[in-house]
Amino acid sequence: MSIKSKLLGAVAGTTLALGAQAALAGGHSEITVAYFLEWPMPFEYAKQMGTYDEELGVKVNWVSFESGVKMSAAMASGDVHLSVSQGVPPFVVAASAGQDLQILDVAVSYADNDNCVVRSDLEIDKDSTAELAGKKVAVPLGTAAHYGFLKQMSHFGVDVGSMEVVDMDPPDGAAAISQGAVDMFCGWGGSLRRAKEH
């Protein structure tokens, strides 16, 4: 294991422990932590080994989510006490809407993990982006992928108002583009890799 990996693991573990201590200070005998399956992180080793339960002295329930937006909703309902890898855009959207959230740490960049894909049979490339007008796009609203989509359309001069934007989690969006139900997909991880096949 490299020094960088060890350092990232220590930072992630410390951050998670600090957040858990805050939840415990609220009188919880167990805590529920939301995490995002698409971005494996160093904390997952300690999760699998039961280290957090042991060190905190309480049961830690782990719940996976497909998007940071859903993590925010679970935190708002009280079902989740702490979110790991929620994403900055979902945090900002939730906090702007009045949700009482606090950032403990920002650990990663999403630059290489999310993007948009246009169905290959449409033969739209960077020189013909005007043809995206009127097209249907699947994008998980309020996420890093949504932010990236808006920035890309702005860069290419495409009016998002001329498109049919459908709020879809990445697995659903990848399935929709593979079936021809949408013309464009924006997402991340395995769903993005699957969407690139179409």
Positions of PLM-derived features:
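Conserved, function-defining micro-sites of small-solute handling proteins
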Residues: 175, 179, 185-186
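Phosphate/pyrophosphate-binding betaalpha-module
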Residues: 193
